Amino acid sequence: MQQYRIDPRIDEDFAAWFAVYQRSELARDEANASGWRPEEIRARAIDDGGPDVTHLLAFGDHGAPPVSVAKVEVTRDDPTPWWRTELHVDPVLRRRGYGSAHLTQLENYVRDRGRREIVVAVIEGANEVGLAPNRLFAPQHGYTLGDESARRDLAWPFPTALRDELLARWRPLAQDYEILTWTSTTPGRWLADRAHLTAVMPSEAPYADLEPLSEEWDGARVRRFEERVASMGRELLVAAARHVTSDSLVAFSELTVSRDSPDTAYQWDTLVLRAHRGHRLGGLMKLATMDLLAHTGLPVRRISTFNSLLNTPMIRVNEELGARLAGANLLWRKTLAST
């Protein structure tokens, strides 16, 4: 058996890849699967001209359904020492050595393309946090834990009384800030600030044991990101905090939801620059994006968010909002031996 790359433009091959991916997700936790729809994964894999693209890999015999599949987030413009990957074995074929065999070839794929380190992301379901097989499998294959995030879910719709209470408590702490909102496209006035916030996020956000990525962002890359989200069929709901004195954006928060499958809205990036923390900007922005979500009228049932266990301030905000633990996301890292 060999690993081979899938062309997402070939419907039959992509469907076979996605079938294994989806079965693995549902076997882990049917109620809390990651929620990526096939057209969303495909959009990320087709965008070959962008600064980043997802490579889809399958493992098995050519002409037969794959026994396992993988994703590799490939960056072109950023001098990143590692690539983030995922590996999913078909649930009916687990414990036969396919995961180990595929992992070896996945490591080779990353190393052969100039990266000295690999990161494998694993999501644990609500009923297996701390007990899932990856906790043994990864160390046995030379991996150490780079970071662990907790997933929390917030029931929707959000109680109006709680929203008003939190707003009244938090707003007085942010007198020198204005909360701005928009959907889909960043206003031109704020495009450079928005790019800067995303560029510095890897160094500003807390990670346990991962070398921060250095990312190059400008207005054009922000626009490309927004176009990709639109091609996925997702609403992009954004709040940002403007520091009145400096007239610059110092924080932002993104909430997304699929228009075709709106059961779960997902909190994507949220960042408050270190110099502006302590003013409850994270909570105020989350309330603002939830107001935008309410205006979409989509039949959402919950909002899901992931926070590094090191990010205690944002965890505290989510718990004050009423979010409850629903799973975990682990990033396993390994330094690859040179050939």
Language-model-detected regions and their locations in the chain:
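Short amphipathic alpha-helix that is part of the acyltransferase structural core
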Residues: M1-P51, L57-F59, P65, R169, ...
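Active-site/acyl-donor-binding loops of N-acyltransferases
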Residues: H141-T160, Y266, D291-T339
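Acyl-donor-binding surface of acyltransferase catalytic domains
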Residues: T104-R189, N329-K334
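Conserved beta-strand-loop-alpha-helix junction that forms the acyl-donor binding cleft
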Residues: P91-R94, V119-P133, L273-R277, I303-I315, ...
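A conserved beta-strand-loop-helix scaffold within acyl/acetyltransferase catalytic domains
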Residues: R28-T54, G60, V69-P79, P202-T264, ...
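Conserved acetyl-CoA pyrophosphate-binding loop and the N-cap/start of the following alpha-helix
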Residues: L93, G97-Q105, H276, R280-A288
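Hydrophobic residues on conserved beta-strands that form the core of alpha/beta folds
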Residues: I6, W82-R84, I179, Q267
